[in-house]
């Protein structure tokens, strides 16, 4: 999960900024679908070694492993021909999906890049909902523990 990558994208221009803001907000809403009442940007950003900008070392728990898997999924998405441009990449692209109850369904109208990214975010949101949140790993000193 590269939620803070938004800051890095600000230098890419106004268009990338507005799109990346929507992409981050969209992932946030997907997490809220699987975990109603959560505050994803506050709770999951800077958690463990992988939740937030960057990621290295050994995940500290199952939630951190969800973030590591999400990072790897985005790395795979970037290898797709349809996900290589600034506007069409995992950190800036948006997609269509539905939330019904706690079930997320990615739209079959998404293009290849959008579909891949939607499923990366969907799997991460589902993963987050199935594992415990350990407060001691929030704002972890990654230089020391990762």
From Swiss-Prot:
Localization: Secreted
Cellular component, GO, one term: extracellular region
Disulphide bridges, residue numbers: 33-99, 49-146, 51-67, 66-127, 73-120, 83-113, 106-118
Cofactors demanded by this protein: Ca(2+)
Calcium recorded as keyword: yes
PTMs per UniProt: Activated by trypsin cleavage in the duodenum. Can also be activated by thrombin or autocatalytically.
Source domain of life: Eukaryota
EC number(s) per entry: 3.1.1.4
Keywords annotated in UniProt: Autocatalytic cleavage, Calcium, Disulfide bond, Hydrolase, Lipid metabolism, Metal-binding, Phospholipid metabolism, Secreted, Signal, Zymogen
Signal peptide: 1-15
Binding-site list for Ca(2+): 50, 52, 54, 71
Keyword Disulfide bond: yes
GO MF term set: bile acid binding; calcium ion binding; calcium-dependent phospholipase A2 activity; phospholipase A2 activity; phospholipid binding; signaling receptor binding
Entry annotation: catalytic residues: 70, 121
Cofactor note (record): Binds 1 Ca(2+) ion per subunit.
Swiss-Prot/TrEMBL catalytic activity: a 1,2-diacyl-sn-glycero-3-phosphocholine + H2O = a 1-acyl-sn-glycero-3-phosphocholine + a fatty acid + H(+); 1,2-ditetradecanoyl-sn-glycero-3-phosphocholine + H2O = 1-tetradecanoyl-sn-glycero-3-phosphocholine + tetradecanoate + H(+); 1,2-dihexadecanoyl-sn-glycero-3-phosphocholine + H2O = 1-hexadecanoyl-sn-glycero-3-phosphocholine + hexadecanoate + H(+); 1-hexadecanoyl-2-(9Z-octadecenoyl)-sn-glycero-3-phosphocholine + H2O = 1-hexadecanoyl-sn-glycero-3-phosphocholine + (9Z)-octadecenoate + H(+)
Top-level enzyme category: hydrolase
Propeptide: 16-22
GO terms (BP aspect): antimicrobial humoral immune response mediated by antimicrobial peptide; cellular response to insulin stimulus; fatty acid biosynthetic process; innate immune response in mucosa; intracellular signal transduction; leukotriene biosynthetic process; lipid catabolic process; neutrophil chemotaxis
Subunit text: Monomer or homodimer.
Function: Secretory calcium-dependent phospholipase A2 that primarily targets dietary phospholipids in the intestinal tract. Hydrolyzes the ester bond of the fatty acyl group attached at sn-2 position of phospholipids (phospholipase A2 activity) with preference for phosphatidylethanolamines and phosphatidylglycerols over phosphatidylcholines. May play a role in the biosynthesis of N-acyl ethanolamines that regulate energy metabolism and inflammation in the intestinal tract.
Database matches in PANTHER family: PHOSPHOLIPASE A2, PHOSPHOLIPASE A2 FAMILY MEMBER
Family of the protein in this entry: Belongs to the phospholipase A2 family.
Protein's name in the database: Phospholipase A2
Origin organism lineage: Eukaryota, Metazoa, Chordata, Craniata, Vertebrata
């Amino acid at each position: 999960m590269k939620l803070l990558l938004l800051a890095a994208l600000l230098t890419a221009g106004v268009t990338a900024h507005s799109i990346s803001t929507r992409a981050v907000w969209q992932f946030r809403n997907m997490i809220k679908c699987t975990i109603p009442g959560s505050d994803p940007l506050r709770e999951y950003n800077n958690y463990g070694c992988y939740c937030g900008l960057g990621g290295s070392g050994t995940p500290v728990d199952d939630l951190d492993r969800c973030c590591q898997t999400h990072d790897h999924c985005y790395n795979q998405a970037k290898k797709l021909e349809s996900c290589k441009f600034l506007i069409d990449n995992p950190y800036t692209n948006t997609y269509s999906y539905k939330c019904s109850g706690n079930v997320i369904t990615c739209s079959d109208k998404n293009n290849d890049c959008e579909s891949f990214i939607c499923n990366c975010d969907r799997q991460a949101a589902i993963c987050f909902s199935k594992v415990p949140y350990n407060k001691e790993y929030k704002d972890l000193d990654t230089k020391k523990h990762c």
